[in-house]
Regions:
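A short, charged helix-loop
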Residues: 174-204
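Glycine-rich flavin
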Residues: 31-169
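Alpha-helical interface subdomain recognition
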Residues: 1-85, 203, 207-357
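Internal, well-ordered alpha-helical segments in soluble enzyme and binding-protein domains
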Residues: 99-103, 141, 177, 213-216, ...
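A short secondary-structure junction signal
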Residues: 157-159, 192-194, 210
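Short helix/loop capping segments that flank catalytic or ligand/cofactor-binding pockets
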Residues: 136, 190-192, 218
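Short, structured patches in soluble enzyme cores that scaffold and shape functional sites
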Residues: 148-151, 171, 183-185, 211, ...
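A broadly conserved detector of short glycine/acidic/proline-rich loop/turn motifs that flank catalytic sites
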Residues: 151, 164, 185-187, 213, ...
Length: 357
């Protein structure tokens, strides 16, 4: 099992500087690739964008250097993940790097040989019961699925080629491809891992989704501000009306709350690793908070924009639709609120330390 060491203040400062540089690099790649608005709700993987991310090392930031990664941490990964979410560009960064790649590195899997000329993309999924179909994000674009199988006596990890699976494709709320797949269990060559690895997988997914929600929320807030200052009704900008001001204020305040909780969680995980109780508490709080804030942000943003915000040409729905999907993935808001209660009631850590550390 991999272990994330505690970072010193100097290492943390260096990681933050690197994260800022990577954020700018990701922004340049995404802005260069920005073209005409899509004319369909479906948002398949842009091969040119993904190729640019692979070429610059952003597609596999946290991977081990020996396996072709950059050996980066959560601060750097969150910067790139958030930039893509803010741009409204669907990319499997969480699935490919922070989940599938991490599972493969942790279990010591060699990886499957590449097939064809397409991107060597992996996605991840968790099997909780044998024979039950699970949702696999980006299955149509991926070459393989790295599976965490918790249906047996002990968690196991294995990798299977998508070509060997029966895949029922569909479209996620945000427009990105996903599929319903019945994954095999008790696979020959599967590697047994600890329960801590299974727990970390879920916390990784939750933190990644919280990062995406917070970043998209900031972009949504800016769209709202731009709209109310330029849209004129009854001879003045609609931002002059008190009811509209209240809607915008609620969007901005919920966004700030989500951003604060997510930043704290990322920083805590970067310092202490996801096996630390304080880090787990911070992740649970971030996902619960981001999920709760998402409801207010999406509702108010569409009230502010009116019908124009739902059109395919407008950037609002390209950010609000993914947020609605992300808030339910890797645990709902209620699930993580229950997890917070569990950590407080049954955990060894002091509540004050969990909140203030």
């Amino acid at each position: 099992m991999t272990h994330t060491p505690t970072l010193t203040d100097d290492q943390l400062a260096e990681a933050q500087e690197t994260a800022a540089e990577l954020r700018n690099l990701a922004r340049d790649i995404l802005s260069d690739a920005a073209g005409e608005a899509p004319d369909t709700v479906e948002r398949p993987l842009d091969p040119a964008v993904w190729a640019a991310l692979e070429e610059t090392g952003l597609a596999r930031l946290t991977g081990l250097e020996a396996a072709g990664g950059s050996d980066a941490g959560w601060l750097e990964a969150a910067a790139v993940l958030g930039e893509a979410a803010a741009a409204g560009t669907p990319l499997p960064l969480l699935e490919h790097d922070l989940l599938a790649g991490w599972l493969r590195d942790t279990a010591g899997l060699p990886g499957l040989p590449p097939s064809g000329d397409g991107p060597v993309l992996a996605t991840a999924a968790e099997v909780v019961a044998a024979g039950r179909a699970v949702t696999v994000p980006w299955a149509a674009a991926a070459a393989s699925v790295v599976v965490l199988d918790v249906s047996g006596a002990a968690p196991q990890v294995y990798e299977v080629a998508v070509a060997d699976l029966e895949v029922h494709e569909r479209v996620a709320v945000g427009g990105e491809p996903q599929a319903a797949v019945t994954l095999p269990t008790a696979v020959a060559g599967a590697v047994t891992v600890s329960q801590e690895v299974a727990d970390e997988f879920r916390h990784r997914g939750a933190l990644g989704r919280a990062v995406q929600i917070a970043a998209a929320a900031e972009a949504i807030t800016q769209l709202c501000v731009d709209h109310v200052t330029t849209r004129v009704q009854f001879g003045r900008p609609i931002g002059k009306f008190q009811a509209v001001q209240q809607l915008v204020t609620d969007v901005a305040s919920e966004t700030a709350l989500a951003r604060t909780m997510v930043d704290r969680a990322v920083l805590t995980v970067a310092r202490h690793g996801l096996q630390d109780p304080t880090a787990q508490f911070a992740v649970a709080a971030a996902k619960a908070c981001a999920g709760a804030s998402a409801e207010v942000i999406v509702r108010n943003a569409h009230q502010i924009h009116g019908a124009i915000g739902t059109t395919l040409e407008h950037g609002l729905q390209r950010r609000t639709r993914p947020v609605l999907g992300w808030r339910r993935e890797f645990g709902t808001t209620a699930d993580w609120e229950d997890r917070l209660e569990e950590l407080v009631v049954t955990g060894d850590a002091d509540l004050w330390d969990l909140i203030t550390r």
